[in-house]
């Protein structure tokens, strides 16, 4: 069920100021966004924030990016914008559709490219930076951030220029309350991206199911409070009751804190229980999309509760346009990848 998030002027102004400071936005900056103004990153992050800072902004039609993704960075090059944004799928869509010739773009003026609004993939960020090596784009410009509508927009940002920092952790460690330590072997692990520290005016904690704050590297519920956080949902008292705990908003995400910042492992409601362990759909999808010939964004993982109601039956959906006979081999490779990556 869709829920309306109520934001006050105080919420918006607090977060706009915090975003401006955290990203070190100055008078020499300018922005480019293809995200619609019906999206909080498009409206608040790349329309209201530039207005607040009195800097130029370029708005690109979303449909144009979908149909002709090359126009995105061509437009950035044309207007020499310094701040760009895209959810993770946008980087995949660009790389899948565009071949960048050496010398065809000059992106040396780009200071930050925000990556948010959905889970951030470290491998996608690395590939994007590698593809654009010849454009003058600094890999440290890639800027993974964390936020949600209930926080107006932003919750945590890394230090500008720090690039994409990640941590590989064992899949079996990603259960509530577990201490999550770096993986000693590359097998059966997932790479999580560091999403920085809370922006000014926003507090963040990681708690267990009883609301007790957990220590660093302990996986739990990500909760927030602050001037930027909504006071509740539109005409939905039950939603407010479910979301707010002693003044803290439960984001619905699971994650852990470290000295480097916040790491989010996934949505609490999306966790699958298979073979006695918790699994996150996006981790399995990410592993399958590394298979040769598998198209980005064409894999979805879900689950169906078993008849015994004891665990979930894993379901993998793949968009496949060739003849069905060819799919048999693809199914075998998917099974092999699941066994190798996660023992499923």
Where do the model's predicted regions map?
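AMP-binding/adenylate-forming catalytic core of the ANL superfamily
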Residues: 77, 84, 226-232, 242, ...
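Conserved AMP-binding A3 loop
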Residues: 1-14
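Thr-Gly-centered strand-to-loop micro-motif
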Residues: 33-34, 60-61, 115-116, 207-209, ...
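Conserved beta-loop-beta connector loops within the AMP-binding
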Residues: 178-223, 257-259, 326
